[in-house]
Regions:
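N-terminal active-site segment of His-dependent metallophosphoesterases
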Residues: 9-13, 18-93
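Acidic, His/Gly-rich catalytic cores of divalent-metal-dependent hydrolytic chemistry
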Residues: 31, 35, 217-302
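Beta-strand-turn-beta hairpins that frame and shape the catalytic cleft
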Residues: 32-41, 155-165, 219-223
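Active-site neighborhood of phospho(di)ester-bond hydrolases with catalytic His/Asp-centered motifs
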Residues: 43-44, 69-75, 97-101, 167, ...
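Active-site environment of divalent metal-dependent phosphoester hydrolases
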Residues: 47-51, 78-81, 102-108, 172-174, ...
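Active-site neighborhood of divalent metal-dependent phosphoester bond hydrolases
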Residues: 92-155, 161-163, 173, 181-202
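A contiguous binding-surface segment within folded domains or other stable secondary-structure elements
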Residues: 176-235
């Protein structure tokens, strides 16, 4: 595992600096994993969902994809009922992890998730409950591990000009929500920031997370792929998470079935009954505040 340190960047951009409790980062940190071909499994948002994390690990093993070729786009800890156990499972598995906003916030001892929710929205209000539960459940060793996670992960084609980069939300803002319908200018801004920070030009692929809904969009010569998350359904009425596999230039999105009944029970046992527990079994989020209008259910149904 090769670490590349690029100095001169204090934080993740103005919006992220606010979200991350004014935490200053002395360097942009990228880890370059490998150059060899072969399948790569990429997933996001375990979200403290131990059942989904165990299912993802088992699926990688079933596919014969070793841990060093499995990459998480961050937010190991979030809404669900087993934050400490999920961190332990991810660490034991040994997959690579990009720092998400939740990891940055928990590592710094912040009082909120820094998710980028607008103040006063349902998502913002609900986050207070699950974030305080998660923070209380994690020991200092887990926080130290989170503190060491990189800002991005690259692989393929050589460290000097990687073929693929994995990030969380954005590089201008770790909590930036980018959707399939977001203006191209927002993606262009992120690609410029990636080129500036990495100093390695433009990759062929960017894999991201944070927003929770997978998509594959071409931005000029770059394919921007949101890998989805495994810890919560993508608001489509099904009780499965999502992940992607890149193999020989082909990207496929797959469903991940997990014990959603058990995951909901763990949330209920923890007292996390503000709505996300129902989302595990209904397949729908408790609020669509964060979604752009065209992705909300009432619009899509019409």
């Amino acid at each position: 595992m090769r670490w590349a340190f690029l100095y001169g960047y204090a934080g993740y951009g103005a919006g992220a600096a606010r979200n991350q409790g004014e935490q200053a980062m002395e360097a942009f940190r990228n880890v370059h994993l490998f150059d060899e071909g072969g399948p790569v499994l990429i997933f996001g948002g375990p979200y403290s969902n131990l059942q989904a994390t165990q299912a993802m690990r088992a699926e990688a093993q079933r596919r014969g994809i070793p841990s060093e070729r499995c990459i998480c786009t961050g937010d190991v800890v979030a809404y669900c009922g087993n934050p400490a156990e999920t961190v332990a499972e991810i660490r034991d598995w040994g997959c690579a992890v990009v720092a998400g906003n939740c990891e940055r916030q928990l590592a710094s001892g912040a009082q909120d998730c820094g998710c980028g929710f607008e103040e006063g929205t349902t998502c913002d209000l609900l986050s207070a409950g699950w974030f305080s539960f998660a923070s209380a459940a994690l020991d200092q060793d887990a926080r130290n591990w989170m503190m060491e996670l990189p800002d991005s992960i690259s692989f393929g084609r050589g460290e000097s000009a990687p073929d693929c980069f994995c990030i969380h939300g954005g590089l201008t803002d770790i909590s930036r929500f980018l959707w399939s319908c977001s203006p191209q200018a927002e993606f262009d801004e992120e690609l410029r920031e990636l080129a500036t920070r990495s100093g390695k030009g433009t990759p062929n692929y960017v894999f991201a997370g944070h927003s929770g809904i997978p998509f594959d969009r071409r931005i000029g010569d770059v394919r921007w792929i949101n890998a989805g998350v495994i810890g919560m359904p993508p608001n489509d009425g099904r009780q499965t998470g999502r992940f992607v596999v890149l193999d020989q230039g082909k990207v496929e999105v797959f469903d991940l079935a997990f014990d959603h009944i058990g995951a909901r029970a763990a949330m209920e046992q923890a007292g996390l009954t503000q709505g996300y527990h129902r989302g595990l079994t209904s397949g729908f989020w408790p609020s669509e505040d964060v979604l752009p209008p065209e992705l909300r259910r009432d619009v899509k149904a019409g």
